[in-house]
Amino acid sequence: MMEKHYVGSEIGQLRSVMLHRPNLSLKRLTPSNCQELLFDDVLSVERAGEEHDIFANTLRQQGIEVLLLTDLLTQTLDITEAKNWLLETQISDYRLGPTFATDVRAWLAEMSHRDLARHLSGGLTYGEIPASIKNMVVDTHDINDFIMKPLPNHLFTRDTSCWIYNGVSINPMAKPARQRETNNLRAIYRWHPQFAGGEFIKYFGDENINYDHATLEGGDVLVIGRGAVLIGMSERTTPQGIEFLAQALFKHRQAERVIAVELPKHRSCMHLDTVMTHIDIDTFSVYPEVVRPDVNCWTLTPDGHGGLKRTQESTLLHAIEKALGIDQVRLITTGGDAFEAEREQWNDANNVLTLRPGVVVGYERNIWTNEKYDKAGITVLPIPGDELGRGRGGARCMSCPLHRDGI
């Protein structure tokens, strides 16, 4: 029976979610390569895995189905067409040369699908291929150089794809370190039995083209419900990407308006959900910088001719209130004094995952903000994040909802 895939809000009952447990890709994160791979630090992989297990089990205990990306990818590789497509896209003739690439693909094709999935996310070094594969390319590389670089940011399943009402955007990622992630998700959504033949829309990102500056990441996309989508214009999500997604949503009659808000272009504000999440019907968790009156905000609507009508909004909060039909948005700001609030925002105090209205999962270390949630009537299910938090992502970043009720 085909599973239902629909995300109608940020706060309706969460029913199914995709996570990725830390694995080989994080073991290959080092002080010398972590910046290139978009991490600020190296993690204790074993401890991060334990913390992730607690996160996953917290969701399961709430009756939420948890699917793991590595399992989905392994099962997708059982389909020969999917396996061949992934090998062709991840082991490119143009990057490795046709002879060497052909030999590496042939060797990988003989692996168990579990091991192949492990390398598709964890990377492959020259030292791991058999000595029988000889080539000029091999001769000019060290054994610890990567044939396929690891994808440690797969941990943040929110970004690579995001479900919006009756469809999914498979996102063209902004940074080279993350762009190969998209092909793993494209294969899963195209061939895995859970999704193949499903009656859902692919809005954006599932074509073999260079998306250039039209990049989009799911951490910037909030499905606030009632036909509205809120998108942050960040260092990762561009106006071009937002326009393409908005046009697709309107074409398929899946949204009535898209609210675009300009974010500061710095690391601590990498995505909208690092500074703002929807946690109850009228309630948002925010780091105050994003709701300043001088922040640029627009509402996009269909112009009736296949294009977009753009309306400048006076404030982000006013735009949200109009979209949701509420009198006033209630804000819960990051807790503590100025120093504590900055520290807790950095440690993802605002990046909580809402399970149902007024119930969220967040890192236990953010004591000041969690106390404010509690006083405001929001239930926090705490999870450890001393290691996971080093990746600069919280519970929302680490989850891709596949089925969630509307409001």
From Swiss-Prot:
Active site: 397 (amidino-cysteine intermediate)
Keywords assigned by UniProt, alphabetized: Arginine metabolism, Cytoplasm, Hydrolase
Localization in the cell: Cytoplasm
Keyword check for Lipoprotein: no
Enzyme Commission number(s) of this protein: 3.5.3.6
GO molecular function annotation: arginine deiminase activity
Pfam family, one: ADI
Superkingdom in the source lineage: Bacteria
Single biological process term from Gene Ontology: arginine deiminase pathway
Main location: cytoplasm
Catalytic activity: L-arginine + H2O = L-citrulline + NH4(+)
Pathway(s) annotated for this protein in UniProt: Amino-acid degradation; L-arginine degradation via ADI pathway; carbamoyl phosphate from L-arginine: step 1/2
GO cellular component, one term: cytoplasm
Family statement: Belongs to the arginine deiminase family.
Family matches, as HAMAP family: Arg_deiminase (MF_00242)
Listed name of the protein: Arginine deiminase
Phylogenetic lineage: Bacteria, Pseudomonadati, Pseudomonadota, Gammaproteobacteria, Enterobacterales
